[in-house]
From Swiss-Prot:
<keyword id="KW-0479">Metal-binding</keyword>
<dbReference type="GO" id="GO:0005506">
    <property type="term" value="F:iron ion binding"/>
</dbReference>
<dbReference type="GO" id="GO:0006572">
    <property type="term" value="P:tyrosine catabolic process"/>
</dbReference>
<comment type="subunit">
    <text>Hexamer; dimer of trimers.</text>
</comment>
<keyword id="KW-0408">Iron</keyword>
<protein>
    <recommendedName>
        <fullName>Homogentisate 1,2-dioxygenase</fullName>
        <ecNumber>1.13.11.5</ecNumber>
    </recommendedName>
</protein>
<feature type="binding site">
    <location>
        <position position="385"/>
    </location>
    <ligand>
        <name>Fe cation</name>
    </ligand>
</feature>
<keyword id="KW-0223">Dioxygenase</keyword>
<dbReference type="GO" id="GO:0004411">
    <property type="term" value="F:homogentisate 1,2-dioxygenase activity"/>
</dbReference>
<keyword id="KW-0585">Phenylalanine catabolism</keyword>
<feature type="binding site">
    <location>
        <position position="349"/>
    </location>
    <ligand>
        <name>Fe cation</name>
    </ligand>
</feature>
<dbReference type="InterPro" id="IPR022950">
    <property type="entry name" value="Homogentis_dOase_bac"/>
</dbReference>
<dbReference type="Pfam" id="PF04209">
    <property type="entry name" value="HgmA_C"/>
</dbReference>
<dbReference type="GO" id="GO:0005737">
    <property type="term" value="C:cytoplasm"/>
</dbReference>
<keyword id="KW-0828">Tyrosine catabolism</keyword>
<comment type="pathway">
    <text>Amino-acid degradation; L-phenylalanine degradation; acetoacetate and fumarate from L-phenylalanine: step 4/6.</text>
</comment>
<feature type="binding site">
    <location>
        <position position="385"/>
    </location>
    <ligand>
        <name>homogentisate</name>
    </ligand>
</feature>
Length: 453
């Protein structure tokens, strides 16, 4: 179905690209959609082939260490200065930026929501974004925002880039095509994609759904990278070869288009007469990518006890403090549970980090009821959380034979900063007022006498 939709979209669209993706994480890639469009041996020829313009897109300061220095050279039909003009302010009232504290009366506590409802009117990807929490300060490039999205229309002649941070998109319902300056990515539920800070893109729908829904982590800080494996060694977790960067693709059309920008928390728009997705060739290491979460190779306890959830980290955005993330992206994928004489679900916990969770499909082992695909939960710093009553009883009394935890994919955006709730999130109809009742059955068992109770 996706292949058919893709062919229909490409027919007569003026879009050009080679087939496929390039594997690897942080590689220095090179790709061209027309033969000879990519200069060899230098970055900025006096005149580029095909009459293209050479332009550098920098994702780090020029003097950043080699290991964190990011830039790509783009060879495009027009330079980006032609994709701008006199901007005017526009409003996306449901997209908030840190620092932001919503004006609401909702008391502090552990929170959970059912999925966003399907939109009752036509909304494209940008119009469908709803900020749930913000953390840190975008102006100092620290922190993040957690968004949910639900949309039902394509960005046809609308284009967008975010100067405030990179966007990690996690589809839950409905596959999407993310067409960036550097190429196109088809992203299905159970896959993620990342769009670097400042990179132009648009989002269209793939397949046939009533709603396209998912989650976004807007990372204001240092870019996401792979976590160090430490004693785990050279393999497992997210392997670099499973990350896919798109090959060059461009859109050559002369039609009224709108370029929209998020800059320091405000939104701006300019009208131009052509598509800005006009990069015919490029090389460099500042690039978008997608990743299939099903290729994550989990590690865990193979004798007793439950390890820390950091072993499930897919990507981490470091802060200035060693071992402390600005934001981590963590998943809880299918895996075998084999620990002996052990309470196998995640333990009860209070944490210096703040956790925003979502469920892509299946059930989450610590919350088998109430936490459904498309739903969300928020456990802020130092607020207690853990398995619900039924999960505790099941895990405490079940036979400890090897069990495969299958058909599940939950995730977490975890940050060192407290996550401030937006007014939208506090007043959302899908907020579960009875969430904390899930622990009400956890009664006192202690009676002062020895023995298992």
């Amino acid at each position: 179905m996706l292949e058919k939709a893709e062919k229909q979209r490409r027919a007569g669209s003026g879009q050009q690209r080679a087939a496929g993706y390039m594997p690897g994480f942080g590689n220095d890639f090179e790709t061209e959609s027309l033969p000879g469009a990519l200069p060899q041996g230098q970055n900025s020829p006096q005149k580029c082939n095909y009459g293209l313009y050479a332009e550098q897109l920098s994702g780090s300061p020029f003097t950043a260490p080699r290991g964190t220095n990011e830039r790509s050279w783009l060879y495009r039909i027009r330079p980006s200065v032609r994709h701008t003009g006199r901007f005017r302010r526009v409003d996306y009232p449901h997209w908030k930026t840190a620092p932001h504290v919503g004006e609401h009366s909702l008391a502090l506590g552990q929170l959970r929501w059912s999925p966003l409802p399907a939109p009752s009117e036509a909304l494209d990807f940008l119009q469908g974004i709803r900020t749930m929490t913000t953390a840190g300060d975008a102006l100092t490039q620290a922190g993040m925002a957690a968004h949910a999205y639900a949309f039902n229309a394509d960005m046809v002649d609308d284009y967008f880039f975010n100067a405030d941070g990179e966007l990690l998109i996690v589809p839950e319902t409905g596959a999407i095509q993310v067409f960036t300056e550097l190429g196109r990515m088809d992203v299905e539920p159970s896959e993620i994609c990342l769009i670097p800070r400042g990179m132009m893109f648009k989002v269209t729908r793939l397949g046939e759904e009533k709603v396209w829904r998912g989650y976004i982590c807007e990372n204001y800080g240092a870019k996401f990278t792979l976590p160090d494996r430490g004693p785990i060694g050279a393999n497992c977790l997210a392997n670099p070869r499973d990350f896919k960067t798109p090959v060059a693709a461009y859109e050559d059309k002369e039609t009224p288009c709108r370029v929209q920008v998020k800059w320091c928390g405000s939104f701006h728009m300019v009208e131009i007469g052509h598509s800005p997705l006009d990069v015919v060739a490029w090389h460099g290491n500042y690039a978008p990518y997608k990743y299939d979460l099903k290729t994550f190779s989990p590690v865990g306890a193979i004798l007793f006890d439950h390890p820390d959830p950091s072993i499930f980290t897919v990507l981490t955005a470091p802060s200035g403090e060693e071992g402390t993330a600005n934001v981590d992206f963590v998943i809880f994928p299918p895996r075998w549970l084999v620990a002996e004489h052990t309470f196998r679900p995640p333990w009860y916990h209070r944490n210096i980090m703040s956790e925003f969770m979502g469920l892509i499909y299946g059930r989450y082992d610590a919350k088998e009821e109430g936490f459904v695909p498309g739903g969300m939960s928020l456990h802020n710093m130092m607020l207690a959380h853990g398995p619900d009553f039924s999960g505790f009883e099941k895990a405490s009394n079940g036979e400890l034979k090897p069990v495969k935890l299958d058909n599940t994919m939950a995730f977490m955006f975890e940050t060192r900063f407290p996550q401030q709730l937006t007014t939208f999130a506090a007043e959302l109809d899908t907020l579960q007022d009875d969430y904390m009742d899930c622990w009400s059955g956890l009664e006192r068992k202690f009676d002062g006498t020895p023995g298992i109770k």
